[in-house]
Amino acid sequence: MGVYIPPGSGGNDNGKSGGSGDNTLTIPNPASFIPQNPSLGLRLWGPLVPASDNLPALYFLTSLQIGIGLLSFNKVRYLRRSNLARFGIENTWQRRSTKWLCAIGGSYLVYQSGIEMSRLAMPYDPWYDEAKFYRKLAIKNGDNPSWWFGATGYYKPMNYKEWYTKIDKWFNNQINIIDAEHENVDTASSQVSTRGKHPQSPLLSSLSRKGKYSEIYQSLHESNIKRYKKLLDQSLKDVNELNKAERLDLIMEGKSSIKYNEEYLKPHIQLGNHRIDTDEEFEMVWLNFEPWDELKMETDYDIRLVPRWRWSEDEDVEASSTESVPTEPTTNLVNEVDESHI
């Protein structure tokens, strides 16, 4: 958001040419400097709400709000037992209004704190994932985001409606997953007990919800076992370290069944020895290596702007105007000048 200040009525100020100056002044919105971290039960704190991925700060602020609510309840008990004469509140109406105000305020603070604690106890929080992602992005770009407020300048947090939609979708998925696990737990256990199958990785076991992915994995595993047994028994039967030099010579001379591809270039993308069995490990590998950035750096591309039409109308107008200019007055003028000199 900005404010546009138009130039003066004279166009050029102090005789300066307007071609080199820029009269546009952009004033940033002051609200953009105020952190706007989302929350369910800490809205009373306004811009002091910490980032959604800063769990220690959220727990501290929630505990502080609960403490203020409990102090309000203690104030209500104190007002009930004392006559409040020493505080200058001798009127019964003032005493009752103060008591009810403390009771309502304390109840509201404790209730809001309970809502916030329930959000922090949830295993999935879209606000947490969003704040954590942009904090990592800011650190990767060389910035130092605030420990309390997070990377507020990199994104605008999602609103409550979008957050609620994602939470509702996640709950429905979890319900479907639990129902599917209860239905297939007996069949899966019987299959594993009868067949001595290869154990699944944690990532694959998390994907095998209704048995589809586990069946695909088992079929691929069995086909791979058959393939490498066939290779070891047939084409790779005589392959060992003793005849390695001889085999390499035959490959380089082109006399082997294995052909050497001289145009092959080894890809630059290397993931190292990192495991990606869990979502956290996969996210760490993806953020550190960024395969799409590697591919973008190794891809050469040219951009050419080709016009879709030719501006022939102006050229035709100029040509017709030059043809229609008469040349006789010019020749007469030259003759008159020559006669005057004579």
From Swiss-Prot:
It is a multi-pass membrane protein. Residues 74-99 are mitochondrial matrix. Keywords: Membrane, Mitochondrion, Mitochondrion inner membrane, Transmembrane, Transmembrane helix. Residues 319-331 have a biased composition (Low complexity). Residues 1-56, 118-342 are mitochondrial intermembrane. One of its GO terms (cellular component) is mitochondrial inner membrane. Residues 8-21 have a biased composition (Gly residues). The chain crosses the membrane at residues 57-73, 100-117. Residues 1-28, 317-342 are annotated as: Disordered. It is found in: Mitochondrion inner membrane. Component of the mitochondrial inner membrane i-AAA protease complex. Component of the mitochondrial inner membrane i-AAA protease complex required for mitochondrial inner membrane protein turnover. Belongs to the MGR1 family. This is Mitochondrial inner membrane i-AAA protease complex subunit MGR1. It comes from Debaryomyces hansenii (strain ATCC 36239 / CBS 767 / BCRC 21394 / JCM 1990 / NBRC 0083 / IGC 2968) (Yeast).
